[in-house]
């Protein structure tokens, strides 16, 4: 079941900064949280883990979403004596899940790489699915993480549509890899302009209701 808005807020306040640190050990990432009805219907469904493990099918999405998300099987009512304990349980599940995801992604790269393949990219998940909470998408900027979230929303709709008529099938692993690590895509990444000084940073400006603080916010956004 979906948590109340107050409970979701409590979880995210406690978990989100910690999780950002975990996924940002190689390069800092910025998160976008989505917990709308469609996302919650998916992550709370009995088929969510099976479908998410199969991966996405749209070639244009692989650079953002990777071949698959990290799905965390968390039930705050299952074992914990209190909600605070449930949040700590979630942290343990996330830490274990991230470690396994990174290992699996490295094996996927080694299994599928070709002599001309670009080097292994950042191997943490860019989409994290948590029952009761929704989706946390990651990117190098807020706008990129929002795009990642929208791409995975599209993937969910494809899965939902496929499951209504038959069974969802993702692209074969090698084909997915060849798209994700396509040399033309790598060339586009290499041609991107250099990141600005505060890229990937989260900035808090105190006293920004008016005057200098407000003007500073407009200048750095």
Task: Please tell me what each predicted stretch does.
Residues 209-210:
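Conserved glycine-rich cofactor-binding loop
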Residues 220:
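Aromatic pocket-lining residues of Rossmann-like dinucleotide-binding sites
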Residues 1-199:
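Domain-length cofactor-binding catalytic modules of enzymes
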Residues 213-214:
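N-terminal Rossmann-fold NAD(P) dinucleotide-binding loop
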């Amino acid at each position: 079941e979906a948590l109340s808005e107050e409970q979701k807020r409590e979880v995210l306040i406690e978990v989100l900064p910690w999780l950002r640190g975990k996924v940002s050990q190689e390069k800092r990432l910025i998160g976008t949280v989505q917990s709308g009805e469609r996302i919650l219907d998916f992550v709370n469904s009995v088929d969510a883990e099976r479908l998410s493990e199969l991966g996405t099918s749209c070639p244009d999405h692989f650079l953002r979403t990777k071949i698959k998300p990290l799905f965390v099987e968390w039930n705050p009512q299952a074992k914990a004596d209190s909600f605070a304990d449930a949040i700590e349980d979630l942290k343990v599940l996330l830490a274990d899940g991230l470690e396994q995801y990174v290992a699996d992604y490295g094996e996927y790269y080694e299994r599928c790489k070709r002599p001309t393949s670009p080097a292994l990219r950042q191997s943490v998940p860019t989409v994290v699915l948590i029952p009761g909470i929704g989706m946390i998408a990651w990117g190098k900027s807020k706008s990129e993480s929002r795009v990642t979230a929208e791409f995975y929303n599209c993937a969910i709709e494809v899965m939902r549509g496929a499951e209504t008529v038959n069974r969802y099938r993702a692209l074969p692993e090698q084909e997915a890899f060849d798209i994700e690590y396509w040399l033309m895509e790598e060339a586009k990444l290499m041609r991107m302009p250099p990141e600005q000084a505060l890229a990937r940073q989260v900035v808090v400006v105190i006293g920004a209701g008016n005057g200098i603080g407000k003007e500073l916010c407009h200048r750095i956004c």
